[in-house]
Amino acid sequence: MIKYRNSSIHIQSVRGMHDCLPKDVIQWQYIEDVLKTILNGYGYNEIRFPIIECTDLFKRSIGEVTDVVEKEMYTFIDQHGNDLTLRPEGTSGCVRAGIENSLFYHQEPRLWYMGPMFRRERPQKGRYRQFHQFSAEAFGCVGPDIDVELILITNRCWKELGISNYLTLELNSIGLLSSRMIYRKKLISFLEKNKHNLDDSSKRRLYSNPMRILDTKNVKIKELLAHAPVLSDYLDDCSKNHFLNLCRLLDIANVTYIVNPYLVRGLDYYNRTVFEWVTDKLGVKKTICAGGRYDDLIKQLGGGSIPAVGFAIGLERVVLLMKLIKSSIINTRNVYIDVYLIRLGTYYQEYSIKLSEHIREKLPFLRLMVDCGGGNFKQQIDRAEKNNSRFVIVVDDKNFFEQTIILKELQSKKQEILKYDEIILKLRKIYNM
């Protein structure tokens, strides 16, 4: 975004979209690595697909009368007249990729992916217009055991990240479409009688998507809904049994949960199981992770009749929660430079290049930075300290001719002179490599 201030051009990021600076990336990478390791351990494979899809994909999958499609998508027409959209969620694109590349043909893939999503919502704490999700999808399994597996995966993620004590699992079953249509009529009838108590948002949804009113944040409407018909009373027997078995398996796995009869998802493709992991540590109750079954979506988008279930974790909210509880679980080693190489004299270039690459080859996990700014010894030491370096290696003309190295610990100021072939053994001992 370009703004003009006092006749000068001021360039800044688009509202609701933020930069992730190096000091923050360290925490992001840690979280992503934990999630990747867990998903890979459960046998899930990574898939990558475009952030831009045909707009019709989201209209058909999410639903044309949802807030996402009606108000929140970033949609544009390209130079060839194609109607395109920046993905507001990942499941639709993942399913499209699976159909297009025949991933579901005689297979039951289990996939994970992560990346940016885009929605034009009002920016606030934990809600951005470009946000990032880590998601998993499992295809071809119809029983509640796969639902449980995904919940167990998320539960394990929270434990590994040290945030499990701050999250609550909420569950519900929204049944089949036929059950929801019966319930929809009952709910509309109830709300019509109390229309004078509805806010503008609920009135707008009354006939287009009344079940979304169940997810309201308005306290007065929540009190009203306490007297409304309950969806569970209208579920078909198969959906009831599916949900009962889901709860039974979670009990066996010692997973604590709350059945929330008002829990619905904002995307039309969901059926039967829906779940959310929520926290109240970010102010108003915030969803950290959400998921559920979408057994009809693949067929709806032109594939076969293949059941599926998935979840999405909001990475920004995980980061916020971990910062709020001041989690010390992050490995801060990557914040620092292990060794900073200072170069002085005439012959430093040849020797420092040879030395630094030798160290990197033998100790690939060591963080080594070579000073390229020039200047005297003090100036280079200052740069080493600004980069949070633990040790410096000093290379000058004398070292070049003697094939030696000065290794200095910045905090203690202790230093020693080592031979070229001794530096690897010394650093291995220091860093237990």
From Swiss-Prot:
InterPro entries assigned: aa-tRNA-synth_II (IPR006195), aa-tRNA-synth_II/BPL/LPL (IPR045864), Anticodon-bd (IPR004154), Anticodon-bd_dom_sf (IPR036621), His-tRNA-ligase (IPR015807), HisRS-like_core (IPR041715), HisRS/HisZ (IPR004516)
Cell inner membrane in keyword set: no
Subcellular location: Cytoplasm
GO biological process assignments: histidyl-tRNA aminoacylation
Top EC class of this enzyme: ligase
GO CC aspect terms: cytoplasm
Sorted UniProt keywords: Aminoacyl-tRNA synthetase, ATP-binding, Cytoplasm, Ligase, Nucleotide-binding, Protein biosynthesis
Domain of life: Bacteria
GO molecular function, one term: histidine-tRNA ligase activity
Entry EC number(s): 6.1.1.21
Main location as per UniProt: cytoplasm
Catalyzed reactions per annotation: tRNA(His) + L-histidine + ATP = L-histidyl-tRNA(His) + AMP + diphosphate + H(+)
Pfam entry (one): HGTP_anticodon
PANTHER family: HISTIDINE--TRNA LIGASE, MITOCHONDRIAL-RELATED (PTHR43707:SF1), HISTIDYL-TRNA SYNTHETASE (PTHR43707)
Record note on quaternary structure: Homodimer.
Similarity comment: Belongs to the class-II aminoacyl-tRNA synthetase family.
Protein's name according to its UniProt entry: Histidine--tRNA ligase
Organism the protein comes from: Blochmanniella floridana
Name of the gene: hisS
